Every structure is written in structure tokens, then in C-alpha cells.
């Protein structure tokens, strides 16, 4: 069945298995209750998924709502990391109607899986009741700016303020939270300012560089030329000449920030547990495509 709802083409599809083995450095399983994402982020690495869908519209203009057989043996995933939203956002606006992510969480209760939810939405607070019953669960919000105008240029997801408010609600409910500063836009993202806003309501503070490839490289480079012309030489140096010195300097800056605030500083690790308030683990995830590992503790190839 297909229909257009609020300008988005909605298609309901059947899938044999909602759980997919993950190739991400964080490992485990990837679970995506939808195909497509209506947040329509201009830098979305998952936009490559369009070619597998048969959709002709642009990424962000369609959403496939998955139907899957009920997970009958959730204990099968005990001890495994389960990432919800690796190539979609399980809390896109349409989740309010279709409730696929809530259904998935209900089926995972009692699994003893290490669940990681990745989102840019505040809708996740609706499911705090389920999250508290899931045991090892982490909710991660992508926040790469405090400038709502820049955010609106890049995506149509919840405002930054709504994300920060949702993070505090989930954190105060006793659920582990992550501020995922991703992607870090050179010359635009001020991760120290973001850290100041969220350090008392997150357990991990992840940093990931902007990685330009595929069709969206031109989109972003054209945007920088139009809105931030003074940054064109920097972006040319990083993304055309492949100079890493900018992000190498940011790594040094991040480590210094960790020392200043007495925070652990790690390289692509996701240790479980709550941390003393105001001292989140700062995670260096720059150039993560070089990271390969087992048991979710991949190390960078240096």
C-alpha cells in the first residue's frame, strides 16, 4: 500500500527479519524499523540506501514502514549490542502514527541486549516507560551545533533545544545518554560550547568528523561556498587535498578538554554504565572508517 501523508510518500513493506548483523565499529546488530528518513539531513551517509528501494523521489521524501514477524526469542540477543537507527531514525515524525519503534522495544523486553538508540528527535521521551524496563539501554542524540539556523539548513528534525530537553528527561529517568557531536563541521561546529550545555545530562560525549563522499559532497561544498565563503579554503584543504591537520588539532583540543573537566578520554570505546554527573566519557570517533575491531572495542589503525 502506498499513500502520501503530509507530503511524504508512505509505503508499507514486509520484511522477513528485522534484526541484521552490523558491520559498524560498535558491532552487534542493526535494527531499522523504517527504510528512508524524513529528517532529510543534507549530509546523510545513509542516503545511498535509496538505490535499493525503487523510490524515484529524493532521500527524505519517502518512508517505507516495515512489518516483520514478532521476535519470539529475544534472549537470543543477550549480551549483544543492538543499534536501533543505523540508517534511519526510529523516531522520525511518522513514528508517532505507526509506532514501529515502540513495537520493537516491546519485543526486546527481557532480551538482556545492550540497546543503543540513535536519534535526532524528542519523541523518544514517549517511550521512557519501556526504556526503564529494558535494562542496558543507551539513547544518543546527534547535536553538532547550537545554531538553530544552521541546523535548519541541514535537517528538518527536532530543534536543538528540544533534543537537549529530551536528553535531560531521559538522563533524569536513570537512562544512559549520549551527546553525539556528529558530524563536526570544520569552522562551524563548536564542540566545547555544546559540551558546556550537555555535560551534566550525558554519560558519553562522542566526536565524529564530517565525512564527505558520494552525492552529498557537492551539496555540502556548494552550501559552504554560499553561506560560509571564508571557509572554502579550509574545506578544499580537508576534502579535496585530504589534509588531516584540522581534525588532528581537534583531537588534541578534545583531549585537553577532557583533562580540564576530569573526563575519561577514549578512542572508539563505549564502556557501559553511568558516570559522575558533569564528567562524561569523551569519545574520539574521528575517521571512524579506519576503525575495525571485535567485541565492540575496535582500535584505530595507526
Cite the ranges covered by each PLM segment.
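Conserved radical SAM core fold
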Residues: 83-92, 122-125, 137-157, 186, ...
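Conserved beta-strand termini and adjacent loop/short-helix elements that scaffold enzyme active sites
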Residues: 120, 142, 266-270
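Anion (oxyanion) recognition and catalysis
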Residues: 109, 171-172, 199, 259
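Conserved Radical SAM active-site core
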Residues: 1-138, 146-149, 160-161, 165, ...
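Conserved strand-turn element in the central/C-terminal portion of the radical SAM core barrel
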Residues: 156, 168-189, 240-244
Amino acid at each position: 500500500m502506498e499513500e502520501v501523508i503530509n507530503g511524504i510518500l508512505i509505503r508499507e513493506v514486509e520484511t522477513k527479519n528485522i534484526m541484521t548483523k552490523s558491520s559498524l565499529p560498535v558491532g552487534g546488530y542493526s535494527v531499522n524499523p523504517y527504510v528512508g528518513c524524513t529528517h532529510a539531513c543534507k549530509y546523510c551517509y545513509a542516503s545511498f540506501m535509496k538505490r535499493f528501494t525503487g523510490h524515484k523521489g529524493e532521500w527524505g521524501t519517502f518512508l517505507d514502514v516495515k512489518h516483520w514477524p514478532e521476535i519470539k526469542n529475544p534472549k537470543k540477543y543477550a549480551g549483544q549490542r543492538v543499534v536501533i537507527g543505523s540508517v534511519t531514525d526510529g523516531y522520525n515524525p511518522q513514528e508517532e502514527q505507526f509506532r514501529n519503534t515502540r513495537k520493537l522495544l516491546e519485543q526486546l523486553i527481557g532480551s538482556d541486549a545492550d540497546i543503543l538508540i540513535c536519534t535526532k528527535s524528542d519523541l523518544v521521551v514517549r517511550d521512557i516507560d519501556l526504556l526503564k524496563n529494558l535494562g542496558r539501554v543507551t539513547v544518543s542524540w546527534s547535536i553538532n551545533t547550537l545554531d538553530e539556523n544552521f541546523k535548519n539548513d541541514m535537517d528538518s528534525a527536532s530543534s536543538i533545544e528540544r533534543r537537549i530537553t529530551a536528553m535531560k528527561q531521559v538522563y533524569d529517568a536513570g537512562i544512559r545518554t549520549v551527546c553525539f557531536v556528529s558530524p563536526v563541521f570544520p569552522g562551524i561546529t563548536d564542540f566545547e560550547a555544546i559540551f558546556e550545555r550537555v555535560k551534566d545530562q550525558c554519560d558519553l560525549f562522542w566526536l565524529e568528523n564530517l565525512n564527505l563522499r558520494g552525492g552529498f559532497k557537492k551539496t555540502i561544498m556548494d552550501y559552504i561556498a554560499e553561506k560560509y565563503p571564508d571557509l572554502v579554503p579550509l574545506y578544499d584543504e580537508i576534502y579535496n587535498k585530504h589534509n588531516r591537520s584540522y581534525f588532528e588539532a581537534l583531537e588534541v583540543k578534545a583531549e585537553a578538554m577532557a583533562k580540564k573537566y576530569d573526563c575519561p578520554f577514549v578512542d572508539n570505546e563505549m564502556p557501559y554504565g553511568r558516570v559522575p554527573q558533569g564528567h562524561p566519557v569523551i569519545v574520539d570517533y574521528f575517521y571512524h572508517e579506519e576503525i575495525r575491531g571485535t567485541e565492540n572495542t575496535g582500535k584505530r589503525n595507526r
